[in-house]
Amino acid sequence: MTRKVQVAAMVAGIIMGISSPAIRAQGLGGLGDMAGNAHQFKPYRRVHLGPKYQDTIIEAMVYECPFCRALNNQTLRWAATLPSSIHFEQMPAAVGKPWISMAQSYFAVAAIDPGILPRFDSESFHLVQDDQDSYSDPRTYALAAEKIGVRPADYLAAMRYKPIQQLVLQDIRIMGKAGIRQTPSLIICGRYVITPGSVQGNYSLYFQLANALASHCISENHLEDKTP
């Protein structure tokens, strides 16, 4: 059996297992036991961010990452299909000092108008990956914001806004606790981390696995789907 077939079988097993009463009765251990009994790797990593994130999916991304760029629009479309009981957040992976400016700029633009974030993403990806501007230089994101119509005065004011600094610190804590070292990563319900590499770069399986783990969280946490 090839590695890709093994991955596909594992994801299918997780999806089917989540709907199984026996697996539901075992709780979180059921997923791990199922993987262990099959002598296969688990296409997710367990983390413990705490109950505050039990209804949240976070995408950790960075603008120098070509896979983040390739998946960005698809990820946002997928997020729009999630049950209303699940909250989706996208945030730069502030895993060290070089990424602080990126995170600060992202949250500043979100504070000004969250509706323009997709355009800010697109411009930032372009500047960093096509124009070779530095991903760690604050001027890169100031230019991205200006190019999408954000007034420089508004941008600078948002950058200095204390709650923005707090969001950056929260971002750093989340990425640290989740052990993020690859992007894009999905942190699902504060319990699981997956990447496209978890499923051998198969984007379809990536989102299927994310849906399966999100469904498991809804069941485990008794989150009510409010979608009409």
Label the model's feature ranges.
Residues Q54, E64-L71, V95-M102, P114-L117, ...:
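Solvent-exposed, acidic/flexible segments
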Residues N72-A79, M102-Y106, L117, D121, ...:
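Extracytoplasmic/secreted envelope proteins and their assembly/folding machinery
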